From Swiss-Prot:
Species for this entry: Streptococcus uberis (strain ATCC BAA-854 / 0140J)
GO CC aspect terms: cytosol
Name recorded for this polypeptide: 6-phospho-beta-galactosidase
Pathway, per record: Carbohydrate metabolism; lactose degradation; D-galactose 6-phosphate and beta-D-glucose from lactose 6-phosphate: step 1/1
Gene Ontology molecular-function annotations: 6-phospho-beta-galactosidase activity; beta-glucosidase activity
InterPro entries according to UniProt: 6P-beta-galactosidase, Glyco_hydro_1, Glyco_hydro_1_AS, Glyco_hydro_1_N_CS, Glycoside_hydrolase_SF
PANTHER family, per the entry: GLYCOSYL HYDROLASE (PTHR10353), LP05116P (PTHR10353:SF36)
Family designation: Belongs to the glycosyl hydrolase 1 family.
Entry keyword set: Glycosidase, Hydrolase
Length: 468
């Protein structure tokens, strides 16, 4: 049976400042930790990315032509405050006014994120969100943006608090490149959630007319053998690290007893302790019912097996299928069932996981209000042939995820939109330019855009709301 989506459903495309804009030193933009980190550790940099800084009118015209009626954009904090606080860079501010005006001119609603992995270098090098001073700096930056950009109707505070802690302090593929420090992972999650709560409370206290929420990456975790209590426990603990800890902070305003028991178990095995203060919980509690929406980024699920050894994580950054490894002391290891498909980067393709995650949020956090799927898509080594890409694999991936969103809506979940990652090809944090996600192919040499087969398909789905 052909499935459909509601008439008012947003069919969006997602971007992020650092991954799309390029122009990393242009018009007074301050440095971010990624600038040097990429130069020192990777085979690529964020120049020129998709040159969105100059070419946004082209991308927004394409969005309009292909029925993409929403776009995720992030403001580069260091374009507005080059050192993270203090003096405002008016050229940066002007750029975003122009960008938002172009969005509205093209009928593409901007959903604007304040922080998408790009803390200004001056603040990142003094501890990023492990340093509580930076909570204050973030809230001041948020306050400035809320006041400066009344044309923005949809705000999100952070993109993917979970993967920031994970990338910076567990896997170590994000600056500062620290590995296996679970206490820092949880402390980063917590301090960023306090920052989020303070910004949301401020937005509501000031009476701004728009909506505000947060974007969480929520990869669903399953036990490898559901009949084995040790595998079930491994999945629960892995879920706490990546999902439950931050969801509790968002919607309960505290960490449930079960969540904290799991956190203590993980820290007992790995060392370290957390600094959780009474005033933190006051603000989390005050903000828990103020979120207007939840953004869910979903790409994959994981299966967890009991494991009794030392921590070892190998990140597959080059698309060499089967090269990744993930096992955490006191938690478990990832072990995928043989019949589940994977991408070249070992990301497990499992649309049912998105359905299960949406329904989990609905069941466990009934104050969620509404959901947007703020990122979902397929990274591929696209082959450019005859001026296009015949990306049937991407179409199939997106189709199956849209179908389970339709199912979730039928089953009572309030899901209002979907943003494909990504609108056009962008640079990928730990994979560079080889891993492409866009509806529009970008020739990074010439910066020309070419619609892929998926763009034509997505246009039709957006036009008809029929998933065909």
């Amino acid at each position: 049976m052909t499935k459909t989506l509601p008439k008012d459903f947003i069919f969006g495309g997602a971007t992020a400042a650092y991954q799309a804009e390029g122009a990393t030193k242009t018009d007074g933009k301050g440095p971010v930790a990624w600038d040097k980190y990429l130069e020192d550790n990777y085979w690529y940099t964020a120049e020129p990315a998709s040159d969105f800084y100059n070419r946004y009118p082209v991308d927004l015209k394409l969005a309009e032509e292909y029925n993409v009626n929403g776009i995720r954009i992030s403001i580069a904090w260091s374009r507005v405050f080059p050192t993270g606080y203090g003096e405002v860079n008016r050229k940066g501010v002007e750029y975003y006014h122009n960008l938002f005006a172009e969005c509205h001119k093209r009928g593409v609603e901007p959903f604007v994120t304040l922080h998408h992995f790009d803390t200004p270098e001056a603040l990142h090098s003094n501890g990023d969100f492990l340093n509580r001073d930076n909570i204050d700096h973030f809230v001041a930056y948020a306050a400035f943006c809320f006041e400066e950009f009344p044309e923005v109707n949809y705000w999100t505070t952070f993109n993917e608090i979970g993967p920031i802690g994970d990338g910076q302090y567990l896997v170590g593929k994000f600056p500062p490149g620290i590995q296996y420090d679970l206490a820092k992972v949880f402390q980063s999650h917590h301090n960023m959630m306090v920052s989020h709560a303070r910004a949301v409370k401020l937005y509501k206290d000031k009476g701004y007319k728009g909506e505000i929420g947060v974007v969480h990456a929520l990869p669903t975790k399953y036990p490898y053998d559901p009949a084995n209590p040790d595998d079930v426990r491994a999945a629960e603990l892995e879920d706490i690290i990546h999902n439950k800890f931050i969801l509790d902070a968002t919607y309960l305003g505290r960490y449930s007893e079960k969540t904290m028991e799991g956190v203590q178990h993980i820290l007992a095995a790995n060392g370290g302790e957390l600094d959780l203060r009474e005033e933190d919980f006051s603000i989390l509690e005050a903000a828990k019912d103020l979120n207007d929406f939840l953004g869910i980024n979903y790409y994959m699920s994981d299966w967890m097996q009991a494991f009794d050894g030392e921590t070892e994580i190998i990140h597959n950054g080059k698309g060499e299928k089967g090269s990744s490894k993930y096992q955490i002391k006191g938690v478990g290891r990832r072990e995928a069932p043989v019949n589940v498909p994977k991408t070249d980067w070992d990301w497990i393709i499992y649309p049912q996981g998105l359905y299960d995650q949406i329904m989990r949020v609905k069941a466990d956090y009934p104050n969620y209000k509404k959901i947007y799927i703020t990122e979902n898509g397929l990274g591929y080594k696209d082959e450019f042939v005859d001026g296009t890409v015949y990306d049937d694999g991407r179409i199939d991936y997106v189709k199956k995820h849209l179908e389970v969103i339709s199912d979730a809506i039928s089953d009572g979940a309030n899901v209002k939109g979907y943003f494909i990652w990504s609108l056009m090809d962008v640079f990928s944090w730990s994979n560079g330019y080889e891993k492409r996600y866009g509806l529009f192919y970008v020739d990074f040499e010439t910066q020309e855009r070419y619609p892929k087969k998926s763009a034509h398909w997505y246009k039709k789905v957006a036009e008809t709301q029929v998933i065909d």
